Structures are given as structure tokens and as C-alpha cells.
Curated annotation (Swiss-Prot):
Gene giving rise to this polypeptide: aroA
Annotated protein name in UniProt: 3-phosphoshikimate 1-carboxyvinyltransferase
One GO term of the biological process aspect: chorismate biosynthetic process
Database matches in Pfam families: EPSP_synthase
SS bonds (residue pairs): none
Amino acid sequence: MVFVSDSSISLPIWDAPRARGPIVSDLAIPGSKSITNRALILAALASTPSTIIDVLRSRDTDLMTDGLRSLGITITEEAVDRYRVEPGQLSAGSVECGLAGTVMRFLPPVAAFADGPVHFDGDPQARVRPMTSILDALRSLGVEVDNNNLPFTVNAGEVPEGGVVEIDASGSSQFVSGLLLSAPRFKNGVTVKHVGGRLPSMPHIEMTVDMLRSAGIEIEESENQWVVHPGEILGRTWRIEPDLSNATPFLAAAAVTGGTIKINHWPIKTTQPGDAIRSILERMGCEVELVAQGEGYDLSVTGPVALKGIEIDMSDIGELTPTVAALAALASTESRLTGIAHLRGHETDRLAALTAEINKLGGKCTELKDGLLIEPASLHGGVWHSYADHRMATAGAIIGLAVDGVQVEDIKTTSKTFPGFENVWEEMVG
């Protein structure tokens, strides 16, 4: 179901800037939300203090920081993008999740180690996001939870024993990651077995496993199963990579306008799903190159004369769907995006939302059982609704580069992961 805000509430409209020629720009992208919030969890559960460098400051990461502070964790801002995290006994408290999936799914297992009840709530949309899998998993591990959706209260009473837990994570890989991040603190560790349909967004689970190992935790992996041994999570220094998924709309600007966009400090080795944009843009006709720069690399993308459509299974990279769908709506040939039925449970039902908004601008988008079919069409201006979804908002901005008169409702919803997005975008377009 697409979340529709109260019609009595007037949301601001942003005139998406139209590109008048090829866009050429060199950009630095803020840190990864996914890595920042995982680092915050691991630092809070560690045995010694940690330092986190190049922290992303956004609504989602601020919600995570505030949630951990409400549980008694000391987080000191040494600089705007540098935190010192001092772990300690977790206490009873109240956590505001907003619309952040990482907060509502990563913090309940952490709350199992608090010395009293922890209450969770969030935005209205958050109350309909899937939560049963993670909450049932906690119950099977001996943790008391009083509801199946937000709002709910977690109350463990004493350190849970742990053990084997079966979970259907076909709706979100965050269910697995949430359990894995806290698993070393359970007395006997935790074995997580996924028993549902195809598991989406595997790179995010790989990110979680990689970071746990970097913090000294032993994990054994097999198909749909993770065995996390009990042990001390080591405090350490975490340096956060740029958020590659947040880079994708800017790279799309090169693809749409035939220009060249360079993203600074692109990691040569990463678990971020956003790295897949390199191969996607190549398949759609772009020139893509990693350029050595000092001790690292920049990513350079130059757009084609005519953008080609793409047929792609996006089950592991679902968060890129709004960017790719926007590109597909502007492409010269048909696109088919599959493997993304789970996006119906994201900030909004992204499949229904993308279909509605593309078609309102004259596009031809058909919602499939597990994806989208997007055919070439001549688009026109109009209001693009964001549904309080940051990636829907950036998709509208992409289309606005090539279509006169596109207006994006509530562009500031991008502050969820990229505060000031619209200012950076306008400066890029010029």
C-alpha cells in the first residue's frame, strides 16, 4: 500500500532544475548511512571505546545516535563528522525510530541487554512497516515483546541465553543484520537461519558480517545460515566510506545529460550495494572509469547520446530502484526491473509509487509481480510526489533534469540520508 499523507497538510514544492546542456561536475558525497549506523551499534556494544570518523549526519543517523543515548550510551561529538562512543550498561529508555529501518530493526535486539523496558515508536508510516520477523525472533530467544508492530516495548530482564533462531527475512535483510549485530552479546551467541523466500539485499548482510569480523567476532557462514560465536566486540576506529547509493542520482545526471560527473573517494573494495551502479550505467550506454587519485580512486561517468534501457534482477540492490527507474523512464528502449517485490515494504510501496508518478508525467510504467516494466514515452511536467521517501524525491530530481516543469513535493525528505541534497543538486546543475 502506498502511504498517502493527510491531504490537509500542504507540503512544499521544489522546482526541479532543468539541465540546459551536459552537466560536468566533481563531487564529494557524505558518509554511508548503512555503515554509520552499523558502526554506532557495534561501538555501543563494544568492550572499549570507539571512534567513528566521517560520520554521516542525517535524520536516520541522528535517530540512531539519539536512540543509543536514550539507552545510556555516551556519544561525544568531537567534530561535526567525528564521534567518540563509550559503551556502558544499557538502561531502560524510549527510542524514536522515525522512518529509519535500521533503527527500528537494529535497536530492538540491543534493547534486550537493557536493565529495564525499552519503548519504541516512530512515524505513522513506520507503524505499517514489517516488523514481525525480528520481534518473533527475539521472543524465540527469550526476550519479551508486547506487540508485532510499532509501537512496542522490549523487556528482557536478564542477559538472554541466545541459541538457534529461524527467521523469514524475505521482506528485508535488515532482520538478519539486526540479529547478527547483537548476537555476540548473547550468552551462547546466536545462530540465525533464514527459512523464507529469496533473501534480498545480500550485500547489506555481507557488510554486517564484514564489520563484525573487523570488531573481532567469529562468524561461520553457510547458505541462509550465520553462526555468531559469543565474545567481546572490540572498540576500534571506524572510517565511514562515502554513501554510494546516495551518489547514484548524481551519476544519473551524467547519464541523462550526456555530461561527466566525478565522485571523489570511490572505494575500490566495498560491500555497499551502490557500487553496482557502475555496471548498470555501463549497460545503459555510459562510459564508466575508476581514476587513480592520490592514495584512492575517483569514479568518472560520462553519459551517452541516447540512454539505453536495461533488463536487470535488482534483488540484491533494491535501494537503487528509484534511480534506475528514473533513468529507464528517460531511456530510448524498454527496461524490466525484477526481483524487487520486497520494495513494497520500504519507506513507501516503492513499486506502486514509482508506477504512479512516472505515469502521471506521461510515462509508461507497469507494475509487475516482482518489479517494473518501463517503456519509452514522451514525458511532460507535473508534480512528483515523494511519499516522505528520500529515494522517491531524488528520482523526481533526475527526471526533472530532462523534462521541463517537474516539481518535487517535499524535497527535504532527502535529509533522511543526505541533508542539503537540493542545494548540492542545484549547484551541480548550475
